[in-house]
Amino acid sequence: MKKLAIAIGAPALILSGAAQADTVVGLYAGAQVWDTSNSGQFGTGNGNQSFAFTDEKQTSFYIAVEHPIPFLPNIKIRENELVSYGATTLTQDFNFNAQVYSANSSITSYVDLSHTDFTLYYELFDNDLIAFDLGMKGKKVDGWLAIREGINENGIRSDGWIPTGYAHLRLGIPGTYLTFYGIANAISVDDSSVHDFEVGAEYRLVDSIALDLNLQIGYRDIKIELDDLDGVYSDLKFKGPYLGLEVHF
């Protein structure tokens, strides 16, 4: 992976001595369906091409483990689907992955930037009114970007790790089962930048000793701006509302 290095996340290590640990081991599992509006452009270093991308329903699944061991970070693993199809009629020649597509040609595109997030974090605050987590995340991308003209497909694979900082804030409303939250993951290095932001509300449907069940309604915004990641250049945006369920044992 070129030009990307960890720029955020050191605060989590610095503050780890003050981090709070769970009194018992907690297991979280969740699933979300995300309605994305997609836009942007991509290329392979000879100029990016914009496409009219389709809106898609994406899915996301995660598990997290929190524990009482001091100084050892908690862990969260999240699988993210990130796929879209596009189409355009070229107004000028477009060189993609060593193949030239002529002006006035009608081409389609396929973007798959699905990835797995691995997050290590500390709980700096953890109570019913306010909870704040800080740490670092690695996005393991298994990407495929392709141009199609007729039955011919020309694609390039882009695999690697994108490190980002991680922050998660939760604010509980006293006397209710309602919680508001925000999650931020971001990095900017040279001409590349990635952000993944979420805001939402969570309502507790089940509150028992055995488990908690939460309904989530939120909005997520991902932007992936790459400058020569395995030869890929991009400025792609995926954003929209989502609905989810989370269970806490």
Regions found by a protein language model. Give the residues of each.
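Flexible, solvent-exposed loop segments that connect beta-strands
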Residues: 37-52, 85-111, 141-158, 190, ...
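Transmembrane beta-strands of outer-membrane beta-barrel pores
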Residues: 31-37, 79-85, 124, 138-144, ...
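Residues on the lipid-exposed face of transmembrane beta-strands in outer-membrane beta-barrel proteins
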Residues: 31, 61-67, 118-122, 136-138, ...
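Membrane-embedded beta-strand positions of outer-membrane beta-barrel proteins
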Residues: 27-31, 63, 75-79, 120, ...
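Residues that define the transmembrane beta-barrel architecture of outer-membrane proteins
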Residues: 23-25, 55-61, 112-116, 130, ...
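Short glycine/proline- and aromatic-enriched beta-strand/turn motifs that initiate or cap beta-hairpins
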Residues: 20-83
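Short loop/turn motifs that connect adjacent beta-strands in outer-membrane beta-barrel proteins
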Residues: 19-25, 68-74, 125-132, 174-178, ...
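Outer-membrane beta-barrel translocator/channel fold
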Residues: 210-249
